[in-house]
């Protein structure tokens, strides 16, 4: 048997030479510098046993990285940095052929000539500006990544050939180039200052960017909106136009929300009875095929959530579309579903009444009123219930809601949209710009209008551009003022920078300029401040934090409106009438959280009325599975599943350790330590008081805490009503504890069926 010293290795150029164990030792020792509880010899031992004669130098490096990553544990969390440094070393060798990165200008020129980068970067910036930025870039920041972060960067974000897996750049170039692209149209006198500040904010993880921006800005493909909302009308032309729009956007990195709630029910009359309608299911299948026709720009698989009202005449057949029973003909399992509910339907449930199902085309005005005017909806609904000439199905509300919650529990991916909250506590005036749907991950609430053809100028496709503040990286809430200004400027510039494959999306985006800025690392933020999800101790801090965030973002958008003018559809917002989120939130929250307001909302109100806003919306709290890993942060507003979680994605199994594990391990509250959903839902309600769009809020159930190890229907319905009571607009995943070890609990797909509208 060969001893490691006898082995020959295959160099990159194909030559064979004796293995240099000293060199390996030097690299591992360098990577271990300053880290605690890591053993160089253990990494070497673990990797040596996997070496073989003729092994390629690349494979040696990969083996050592993997050996270090396998040692990551609660007792030895620093191996995540040792493995990351080795991976960065390897990455630079692959991208540049050596450890030292090239000059920024040389790098950009080389990749532009190769067709990987957009030519405008070389055209817009002078050689002197390149020199100044090259001197500013801090490549040492690559050393602060965790292993999970480097693997996510390699898999999803760094510009590469996705077929051969050849990577062409390293993280600091990614960050500075995103900044250069977004601020390229700013005046020469100020733009380098913005580029540097934005580079600092993103490369030190204070601001987190979504996948489409990280992987796409600087390349020739210019579509970076994370979420696309497409509404379909009750006509074949519109169904075809919707299908084309889905294909166009799925191929360009976007996740889709489809509103199909207007489509008439099975056996409705077509052309006055000349034909019978085949119902929704054949058309939903068509949408599923369109969604799955492309992967999102090679970065992730296509994904969509489809919306319909709970009172649709086919509701009973639609609620079961995702489950594992039934046959192919009556199941559409590759879409997620958003079921739309309002006050009247909940009232019928509470009072033990019935729900009447209708086909939307047979009840004039009802579908529009469902979103725009709750009193009018109630008047029409009861009127149509009493009309003997209208086709209907009557079901006990308890039965329909039980089916809904059973399917939500069984699949985890039947989502809830409270459409009244989405319109009464909204930046948009529902009389002129009602919100009819949400998006893939349930955090977007923007107006849409159906298309009759793909070039329909009267249709409206809503796009939302996302990013997030890292709460854990803030020193104080006033820091949000500068970060809000930078982020709003960058994302607003992005709207003009990107291309629009469908005209209905361009006109809508140019008119509304909607942004969705959220947060990551909330669980760490709570732990660091010594408060918890479950006991009410975090309510005050959460109120202060989200107040500051919404206040400073609105302020940034007013300042931008002073410079560039308000968005052209500002008159369709309630902001133009002087209304603010602090006026329209659900007052039931006051009994839960009595924290006063700390900012000068009245002078902000006056400024908004006077100057307008550059952006109709500013906030949305999205899931952030991937970009949280980059920042080594906890996911969005979620409690972690364990202090060390194992995540499986197509780039392999990754271990992630919560921030400041050593000092805060007893301060964290993990998902399955929460006694129930109530504490979490109250916090979501407090966030929703300020957040102008919606929140990807999840519910979680541990069957072990229930009689007979079965989650009770009563508890699920109680949580649904609690969420409604506190003004929560949407509910996303339903998580069930499956009894696996907590460190393994996160092995699933990338969530969001491919992660499109998360960051």
Regions found by a protein language model. Name each.
Residues 126-152, 436, 442-448, 491, ...:
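Catalytic alpha/beta core of large soluble enzyme barrels
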Residues 1, 744-759:
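Acidic, low-complexity intrinsically disordered tails
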Residues 320, 329, 333-411, 419:
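Polar, glycine-rich mid-to-C-terminal structural blocks
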Residues 159, 166, 173-191, 195, ...:
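Function-dense linear segments that define catalytic or interfacial modules
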């Amino acid at each position: 048997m060969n001893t490691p010293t006898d082995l020959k290795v295959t160099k990159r150029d194909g030559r064979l030479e004796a293995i240099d164990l000293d060199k390996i030792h030097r690299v591992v020792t360098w990577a271990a510098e300053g880290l605690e509880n890591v053993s160089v010899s253990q990494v070497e031992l673990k990797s040596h046993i996997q070496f073989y004669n003729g092994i390629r130098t690349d494979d040696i490096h990969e083996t050592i990285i993997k050996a270090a990553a396998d040692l990551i544990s609660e007792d030895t969390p620093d191996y995540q940095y040792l493995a990351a440094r080795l991976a960065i070393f390897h990455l630079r060798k692959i991208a540049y052929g050596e450890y030292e990165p090239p000059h920024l200008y040389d790098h950009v020129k080389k990749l532009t000539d190769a067709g990987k980068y957009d030519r405008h970067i070389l055209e817009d910036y002078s050689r002197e500006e390149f020199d100044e930025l090259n001197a500013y870039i801090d490549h040492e920041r690559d050393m602060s990544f965790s292993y999970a972060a480097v693997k996510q960067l390699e898999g999803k974000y760094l510009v590469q050939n996705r077929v051969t897996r050849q990577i062409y750049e390293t993280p600091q170039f990614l960050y500075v180039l995103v900044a250069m692209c977004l601020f390229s149209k700013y005046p020469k006198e100020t733009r380098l200052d913005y580029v540097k500040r934005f580079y600092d904010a993103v490369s030190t993880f204070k601001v987190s960017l979504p996948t489409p921006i990280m992987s796409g800005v600087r390349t020739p493909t210019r579509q970076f909106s994370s979420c696309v909302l497409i509404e379909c009308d009750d006509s074949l032309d519109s169904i075809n136009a919707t299908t084309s729009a889905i294909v166009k956007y799925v191929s360009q990195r976007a996740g889709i929300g489809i509103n199909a709630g207007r489509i008439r029910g099975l056996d409705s009359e077509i052309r006055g009875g000349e034909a019978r309608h085949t119902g929704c299911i054949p058309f939903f299948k068509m949408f599923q095929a369109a969604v799955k026709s492309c992967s999102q720009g090679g970065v992730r698989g296509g994904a969509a959530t489809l919306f319909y009202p709970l009172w649709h005449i086919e509701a009973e057949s639609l609620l079961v579309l995702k489950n594992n029973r039934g046959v192919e003909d009556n199941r559409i399992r590759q879409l997620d579903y958003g079921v739309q509910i309002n006050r009247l339907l909940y009232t019928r449930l509470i009072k033990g009444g019935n729900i009447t199902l209708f086909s939307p085309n047979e009840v004039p005005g009802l579908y529009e009123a469902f979103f725009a005017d709750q009193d009018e909806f109630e008047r029409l609904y009861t009127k149509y219930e009493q009309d003997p000439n209208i086709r209907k199905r009557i079901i006990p509300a308890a039965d329909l809601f039980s089916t809904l919650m059973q399917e939500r529990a069984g699949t985890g991916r039947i989502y809830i949209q409270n459409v009244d909250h989405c319109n009464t506590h909204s930046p948009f005036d529902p009389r002129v710009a009602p919100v009819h749907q949400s998006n893939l991950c349930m955090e977007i609430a923007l107006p849409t209008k159906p298309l009759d053809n793909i070039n329909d100028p009267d249709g409206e496709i809503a796009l939302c551009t996302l990013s997030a503040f890292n709460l854990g990286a803030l020193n104080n809430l006033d820091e949000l003022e500068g970060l809000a200004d930078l982020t709003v400027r960058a994302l607003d510039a992005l709207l003009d920078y990107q291309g629009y494959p469908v005209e209905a999306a361009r006109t809508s985006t140019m008119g509304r300029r909607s942004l969705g800025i959220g947060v990551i690392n909330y669980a760490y933020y709570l732990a660091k401040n010594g408060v918890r999800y479950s006991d009410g101790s975090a309510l005050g801090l959460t109120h202060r934090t989200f107040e500051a965030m919404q206040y400073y973002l609105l302020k940034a958008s007013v300042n931008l409106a002073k410079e560039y003018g308000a968005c052209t559809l500002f008159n369709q917002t309630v902001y133009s009438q002087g209304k603010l989120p602090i006026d329209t939130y659900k007052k039931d929250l006051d009994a839960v959280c009595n924290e006063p307001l700390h900012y000068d909302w009245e002078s902000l109100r006056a400024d908004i009325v006077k100057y307008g806003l550059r952006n109709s919306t500013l906030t949305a709290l999205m899931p952030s599975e991937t970009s949280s890993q980059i920042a080594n942060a906890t996911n969005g507003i979620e409690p972690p599943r364990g202090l060390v979680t194992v995540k499986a994605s197509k780039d392999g199994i990754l271990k992630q350790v919560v921030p400041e594990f050593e000092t805060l391990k007893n301060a964290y509250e993990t998902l399955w330590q929460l006694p129930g959903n109530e504490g979490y839902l109250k916090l979501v309600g407090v966030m929703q008081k300020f957040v102008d769009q919606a929140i990807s809020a999840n519910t979680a159930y541990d069957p072990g805490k229930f009689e007979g190890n079965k989650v009770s229907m009563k508890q699920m319905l109680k949580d649904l009503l609690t969420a409604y009571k506190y003004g929560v607009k949407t509910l996303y995943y339903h998580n069930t504890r499956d009894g696996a070890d907590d460190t393994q609990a996160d092995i699933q797909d990338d969530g969001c069926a491919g992660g499109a509208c998360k960051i």
